[in-house]
Amino acid sequence: MRRVLKYGGTSIESADRIRRAAQNIAQLLKSGDQLAVVVSAQGNDTNLRLNSVYTATERHADLQSMYRVVALGEEKSTFLLTAALRSLSVDAVPFVPSVAETWPLIVDSPDGALLQAQKINEERPLEVQEDESRRLFGARVLPVLRRGGVAVISGFFARSMRGDLTTLGRGGSDISGVLVGRFLDAEEVTIITDVEGILSADPRLAENPRLIEEMTVEDLETMASRGARVVHPRALRYKPESCRVRVVDFRRQEALAQSGTSVLGVSEPSLSARSEPQSMLTLVGKDLAGRTGVLGELASQLGRAGIAITASTTNDTFVCLYLAERDGEAAYRLLHSLMTGSQREMGLVNVTLRPGVAEVRLRSPEFLQTPGILAEITSVLA
């Protein structure tokens, strides 16, 4: 199997952990795997280097100088792991962004301009130079794997077509790992981090959450859009269909095939429409956000009548329910009798019915990072 291992900063934050990673890599190599390894800076190294640059320059460092200093964190990890692997008689070859002659990953900003220093770690649009990167990976990295060696590659950084250093922004090391897998046609990218995989709940908030062994890219992007962070969703945009992403706890890295969560599928936009016309029921009231159980009671009453809600919207002054058009009038009469009868304390004062509503569903991972996208979509519909 051709595999990419991506080690997060916690996973290699000490010399002992680097040694353990090297031993695991050497063992995988003996089993016949072709391996490339992507490494983050150790622990809090990036922030320490940023603070040093800010202090030394009174926050007036030019961007390339800052990148060179910060990149030393990833390069240190790269050379430490390379040394550890060589001590185990592994043919390890380092690839660091400061050495342009061997570096394979080429990424530009859309306008070709350098970004502001204070935004070194922000989310940014990227233009991955697919053809050039694939050519360089084929010429520089693949030969190492084919002869039985290990390519050790710095994460988070890239070079532009004009040769400048740049970063991949938030989630950059995850992006690096997936891109390396993409350009090496790897069967799996294994992200080795400080959690055991993707869980059914946050273990800090819920007892005994269970490990989810498999999930789709779409599901993971949905989780990430609502605050969950295991694999950065930006990284998943570059995942090929043929490549599996696996999230594994560094404490269980010796059992890669038996642990963690596998992420399957690809990240792609979708457009669909509900085939059946909908009705929109709008219930108006006061201080609805401060009242407990309003939406639950409405849904319960409709459910007992065999009427399904397909979507809902609420705020402090109204509850808007969407349901099949054929159920609209029955639901209207039911909810009107509810708000004027036994449930007047819910604070609802008026209900309106609008039939003939169409439902169009658009989904894209780009929506989260695209300001004004809702206005653009609704302007087309208007």
What are these regions (language model features)?
Residues 1-231, 235-236:
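Nucleotide/pyrophosphate-binding catalytic subdomain
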Residues 188-192, 245-247, 310:
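Short hydrophobic alpha-helical runs that function as membrane-insertion/retention elements
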Residues 255-382:
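A conserved regulatory-domain signal marking ACT and ACT-like small-molecule sensing domains
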